[in-house]
Regions:
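A generic structural micro-feature
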Residues: 1-3, 48-50, 63-67, 93-97, ...
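Hydrophobic pocket/interface hotspot
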Residues: 20-24, 31, 56, 73, ...
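C-terminal helix/juxtamembrane-tail motif
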Residues: 2-4, 106, 132-152
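Hydrophobic ligand-binding cavity/cleft-lining segments
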Residues: 1-51
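Beta-strand/loop substructures that line and gate deep hydrophobic ligand-binding cavities in soluble
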Residues: 84-140
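Intrinsically disordered, low-complexity basic segments at termini and long loops, enriched
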Residues: 10-14, 87, 139, 147
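Glycine-rich portal/gate segments that line the openings of hydrophobic small-molecule binding cavities
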Residues: 40-93
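Hydrophobic/aromatic beta-strand elements that line small-molecule binding cavities or substrate pockets
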Residues: 9-11, 69-75, 99-107
């Protein structure tokens, strides 16, 4: 059984790609007020939510249970509308040595977009399940962000 793996989910949204991506690079702190499964988010290190290497604390609901973790942005590629995040510490570190996710938004010809979330992980041992619950978390969260942006 492999310890490393990759999972991804693609979510079709009605919001234009640039507007959808923009909330993640300029208003990331608002996600806790938009997404039902984000209970809390706050700065741990740094003073800007939207720059690489600033560290945030998050409490999320994944698989029906609250989990705590830290997150930092590793890279932002505005041209390709992608952000690479590293999730670590807290409950993540209990099961995974490595837990990164790539968020990317693709334009669609109808004016909407596709939001893609890809997790790359390494489990601490083979008894740990792949992080399938995060796929549901990202799917639901992406739709909540879309709904919020369509009303804005």
């Amino acid at each position: 059984m492999a310890l490393s793996g990759k999972l991804s989910v693609e979510v079709t949204v009605q919001t234009p790609a640039a507007k959808y991506f923009n909330i993640f690079i300029t208003q990331f702190h608002k996600l806790q007020n938009i997404c039902e499964r984000i209970l809390e988010g706050n700065m741990h290190e740094g003073d800007n939510w939207h720059v690489p290497h600033s560290v945030k604390n998050w409490t999320l609901i994944v698989d029906g249970k609250p989990i705590k973790l830290k997150e930092k942005i590793e890279a932002i590629d505005k041209e390709n509308k992608s952000i690479t995040y590293n999730l670590f510490d807290g409950d993540i570190s209990k099961n995974y040595k490595v837990f990164k996710f790539l968020f990317q938004v693709f334009e669609k010809s109808d004016g909407g977009a596709t939001a893609k979330f890809t997790i790359e992980y390494e489990k601490i041992n083979e008894n740990v399940e792949a992080p399938y619950g995060f796929m549901e978390f990202f799917d639901k969260g992406a739709k909540e962000v879309d709904s919020y942006l369509l009303k804005a």
